[in-house]
Regions:
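Conserved RNA-binding domains used in RNP assembly and mRNA/RNA metabolism
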Residues: 1-230
Length: 230
């Protein structure tokens, strides 16, 4: 068994060359900011949906409480259970809509893996953003899961229904663009991402906006009022 062992234990070393992407990970109770690893030529979507393992390795990690965003701990390496990951995005894909602690300069950890380290890792400053590799239709949807609601565009193959995309067992995470994430209990806008991945296991309801009727007073379910129309 080959392992890198030093006074801090076993560190993570990719067995094949991968790109390091700074990621934002949201679980029910935690916010995790750190580096995840993607094979060259793969998108983050491809990497997560094709990984047969149960845990995602993350390095250079900062962990915050999801409720009050208070810093909890920092680690050079953790493993996050896929079943607990609700949302995951490249950090650079998040718009700055408010001050958050993980964007503070003092929050930057000392990197475990640096550009001059020979660990089979490429450091990408911006990572890989979402590109549709097969023609798909963008469908504006509201997605509910627990106390989170996400409004944004899901993608459906032209000869598929939305139901078919959601029932695709190969899609552990569903890509969404122009995604706004709200806390349902107070309708607060938490994050706005040009691209994020939603854990299929965490979804309670998916509602295409065009299919919703009635009047809504919540920001994550915008419904065109029919009042005054003949």
């Amino acid at each position: 068994m080959e392992a890198r062992i030093d006074e801090k234990g076993k560190f993570f070393t990719p067995r094949i060359t991968k790109d390091a992407i700074t990621a934002f990970v949201r679980t029910a109770n935690k916010i995790i900011v750190g580096s995840v690893y993607v094979r060259p030529g793969n998108r983050l979507t491809d990497e997560l949906n094709n990984d047969p393992s149960s845990f995602l390795p993350i390095t250079d990690v900062r962990v915050y409480d999801a409720e009050d965003e208070r810093f909890q701990f920092q680690s050079s390496f953790i493993l996050a259970a896929y079943r607990e990951i609700l949302l995951i995005s490249e950090l650079d894909a998040l718009a700055t809509i408010r001050d958050v602690p993980w964007n503070a300069p003092s929050a930057e950890p000392t990197p475990l893996i640096r550009e001059d380290d020979n660990l089979g890792v490429h450091i990408n400053e911006r990572g890989k953003y979402f590109t549709v590799r097969t023609p798909k239709d963008a469908v504006l949807c509201a997605v509910r899961g627990g106390d989170l609601a996400v409004l944004g565009y899901l993608y459906v193959r032209p000869d598929w229904r939305l139901k078919d995309e959601l029932n695709d067992d190969q899609a552990r995470y569903l890509p969404m663009t122009d995604a706004r994430v709200f806390r349902v209990s107070n309708n607060m806008l938490l994050y706005h991402a040009s691209f994020l991945l939603i854990g299929r296991h965490a979804i309670d309801i998916v509602a295409p906006i065009d299919a919703v009727t009635g009047v809504s007073n919540v920001p994550w379910l915008p419904i065109r009022s029919t009042e005054g129309e003949g």
